[in-house]
Amino acid sequence: MSERIEKIMTVGITGASGGMYGVRLTQELLRQEYKVHLVLTEAAWQVFKEELLLDTTDRQKVIHELFGDLPGELHTHDLHDYAAPIASGSYRSAGMVIIPCSMGTLSGMAHGASGNLLERTADVMLKEKRKLVIVPRETPLHDIHLENMLKLSKMGATILPAMPGYYHLPKTIDDLINFLVGKALDSLGVEHTLFTRWGE
């Protein structure tokens, strides 16, 4: 029995500040019963420890605490597992989002390095002309950062900087997180009610 391709997504979380963006987006996909392939870099685990104040000694326990009670299907992959299904273009999915995306990962993707599973899967999205949403989180940006974003945009990726809007009158940090996650989901074509849209 074939899977519904439109309900399969890959999420990458890197060591850029803002790990909660990736957590919230993954949670929302799972709530909507998506099959999610999750790849975290080593630096992402450090961010989980520093920003989310999580004890990352037992990583499987952390994954269960963050996502275990949600109805979707979660598959976590080692950063260097090139045998993972998402490393191949023959494995079909609706798209991929890297949220937040560090400048190191951005550079690897822009130059086709495929130095780890995250970069390889992004390379697959580009070559197969599938949705790839990149949420860079860095400030300020120098020329190489900007050139890499432009290069990826020209190859078909959506560059969605971690810049929350304020027209929805956010009252909490959660409101700001939900806005950005909602914009990323919009770019992936995923319905949601994470923020009030302009004119609603």
From Swiss-Prot:
Q: Which domain of life is it from?
A: Bacteria
Keywords of the record? Flavoprotein, FMN, Prenyltransferase, Transferase
What is the E.C. number?
2.5.1.129
Against Pfam families, the record matches this protein to: Flavoprotein
Enzyme class label: transferase
The record's section on InterPro entries has: Flavin_trans-like (IPR036551), Flavoprotein (IPR003382), UbiX-like (IPR004507)
Q: Where does dimethylallyl phosphate bind?
A: Y167, K183
Q: Name one GO molecular function term.
A: flavin prenyltransferase activity
Q: Where does FMN bind?
A: G15, A16, S17, T41, S102, M103, G104, T105, R137
Q: Which reaction does it catalyse?
A: dimethylallyl phosphate + FMNH2 = prenylated FMNH2 + phosphate
Q: What does this protein do?
A: Flavin prenyltransferase that catalyzes the synthesis of the prenylated FMN cofactor (prenyl-FMN) for 4-hydroxy-3-polyprenylbenzoic acid decarboxylase UbiD. The prenyltransferase is metal-independent and links a dimethylallyl moiety from dimethylallyl monophosphate (DMAP) to the flavin N5 and C6 atoms of FMN.
By sequence similarity, the record places it as follows:
Belongs to the UbiX/PAD1 family.
**Can you name this protein?**
Flavin prenyltransferase UbiX
User: Taxonomic lineage of this organism?
Assistant: Bacteria, Bacillati, Bacillota, Bacilli, Bacillales
GN (gene name): ubiX
